[in-house]
């Protein structure tokens, strides 16, 4: 799927990927939905999240927290309070540790609550997009607080691209779960 470059493409991609993710989740048995990941050596040495996330709750908690990053960043900067996208003290070289903090934060969150949270935060992100223009979303420099990127790029990353990431993990989980 090509990366969205218009508001409508962004909304469509985010919602389409979100629906696909829930269809994949709903196709799993309850036992599979609640089972711990068992990726073994299949993904050993790849991205840190393969070792960090233990189950689907962790994936949904992660998605929710990245929605919150986007929502807080946009709301703060739009109201005139200069705020970086990532939480302090993190930067793009150290944000992996921030993801570990998110993981730790949701260790006691039940799967059902994580599902409710990510569905609610997705809806909030979609509402946030409504009043924005194509220029605000996809023109570099239109919003000075987006730096050398665009707001739309951050939105794609926190929605459609992240849902694709979640589906990749879900598919790997289905494969390893079926092999057990």
Named regions from a protein language model:
Residues 1-26:
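Extreme N-terminal tail/first-helix region
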Residues 1-2, 43-47, 98-106:
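A short small-residue
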Residues 8-15, 60, 64, 112-115, ...:
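Short amphipathic alpha-helical segments with heptad-repeat character
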Residues 18-29, 67-71, 75, 119-133, ...:
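Structural signal for well-ordered, non-membrane alpha-helices
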Residues 27-46:
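Short secondary-structure junction/hinge motifs that connect adjacent elements
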Residues 40-97, 136-180:
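Short, contiguous alpha-helical
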Residues 92-139:
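Acidic/histidine-rich alpha-helical segments that form the ligand environment
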């Amino acid at each position: 799927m090509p990366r969205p470059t218009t508001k409508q493409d962004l909304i469509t991609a985010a919602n389409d990927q979100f629906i696909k993710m829930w269809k994949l989740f709903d196709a799993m048995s309850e036992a599979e939905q609640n089972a711990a990941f068992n990726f073994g050596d299949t993904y050993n040495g790849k991205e840190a999240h393969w070792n960090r996330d233990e189950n689907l709750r962790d994936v949904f908690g992660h998605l929710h927290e990245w929605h919150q990053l986007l929502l807080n960043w946009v709301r703060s900067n739009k109201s005139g309070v200069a705020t970086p996208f990532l939480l302090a003290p993190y930067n793009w070289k150290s944000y992996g540790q921030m993801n570990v903090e998110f993981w730790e934060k949701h260790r006691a969150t039940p799967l059902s609550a994580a599902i409710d949270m990510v569905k609610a935060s997705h809806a909030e992100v979609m509402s946030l997009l409504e009043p924005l223009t194509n220029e605000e979303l996809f023109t570099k420099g239109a919003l000075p607080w987006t730096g050398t990127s665009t707001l739309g790029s951050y939105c794609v990353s926190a929605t459609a691209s992240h849902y694709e990431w979640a589906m990749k993990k879900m598919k790997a989980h289905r494969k390893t779960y079926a092999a057990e």
